[in-house]
Amino acid sequence: MTGKLHQLGPQTKIFLVIKAKKTLTPEFIKQQIGRAFRDLLGSLAVPSLAMPASVRGALGGADNQSAVASAMVHFGVTEADLKKVMAAALEKGGDYADLYFEHTFNNNVVLMDGKVNNCGANIDFGMGVRVLAGDQTGYAYVEGVTMEEMLRAARTAARIASSGKAGKSVGLTEKTIAKSRYAVTEPWEDVSVKAKIPYLEKLNEKIFSLDNRVRKVQASLSDSTSHVLFCNSEGVSYYDYRPMVSFMAVCIMEENGKMENGYAGRSYRKGFEFMTDDIVDIIAREAVDKTAILFKAVKPKGGEMPVVMGAGGSGILLHEAIGHAFEADFNRKRTSIFCDLLGKKVCDEHINVVDDGTIAFNRGAVNFDDEGVEGQKTYIVKEGILTSYLHDRISAKHYGVAPTGNGRRDTFRNTPIPRMRATYMEAGNMKEADIISTVKKGIYCDQFTNGQVQIGAGDFTFFVKSGYLIEDGKLTQPVKDINIIGNGPKALADITMVANNDKIDNGTWTCGKDGQSCPVTCGMPSALVSKLTVGGES
């Protein structure tokens, strides 16, 4: 039956959503619908939606000088148009204005019970205008790029942030980097659904082949491509091509009438070249291993005890419980517990915490943030000292420092705010086994799932899917379904040992804040927190 798994089942859901009003002609809409269904039937994707080859050629860094000009052609605007809209944005006295154009394609294919039962496509198109005047921010967006629509958005934003004296913009200068951090060789725009399905089939078959206890598998593949054109009243302009792929599986197993489930996935800023038999094998084995261990696991007794955070995925605790409190908007508003601690010691001197937008192909990587600032590596904590918050343009101006490249937004419908990218703790100088050997009785955390954090106080609760008991310095009984309860700043201060096995978790992490979602990653080496409350059996 494997030869027929690619066929659409009777319950298959097919979605095509085109979010771009007025500027899309009936002929354009018809073209997109035709493309979507030709994809589903297996033909090659029509390249008309792709960015021109002149821009794609620039993505590798060899020649990026024509990228903005080609992007203007793609969006149907000229430099004169941009200057006219910018002038309208500043006509009420704004200190600063920027224009953000976005054209995004999202695709998703899900295979369940050996059949494709969900196949969706989404096209998003529009632009937003932001105006800053003192402490005021005006923002408006339109789902189209006619001059009438852009001027309406610009004047709406200008009225919101008005100081009464017209501002001035300058000529545009293209901003480039030497080499894209996520140049692709096989763009998703050129890949049909038919070409993707075999990898879902292979993942499904591989998981079933690894363990006869497997009862159900859900395999899914999501890809997206965003074309972003940005310019501001300071003369900065750039074009960014942003690919993304997420490949994942949920595995359900049964043993003696008992059911368990596990998940594994990978996500990168890569094109179709990411899809290989090796990545299928990695995800399949991880999904099975994470599920199988749960049959042996027990719920431990609760209480306060030492906790060893495993390398990689434990970085979610660093991101959620501590990382958000380092974002500058929370500190500017004095809602973060770290608002008065800049330049002060917040943890042991062997700890360095970084937020990095420069890791090649990383889910959280940025060539430029959504305010025109080039991606960079920012030390939040250096040798135990809080050295920097994560800044957007507004917070950087407040603190009198340069932006850190953390001004990010969900879509053109949103204003940029300080957001993390790849947040991790750098390696220490100890071996993980040596750290574990110091613990008489405690918990080793392996898989984290969801959690809750109060940004102000820093209190958190995290659910640990699986881990191990530590008894007399050794990992013993697997454990599952436990809660870790603590306070972020205190937990950071209570880290007493850090291993040399630093690891970035390249899972499908997405961070939510103020109603916006952004792709991120996290990571850390194994580390000992001297005491946390573990919620288990009474």
Language model segments and positions:
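N-terminal small-residue-enriched
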Residues: 3-538
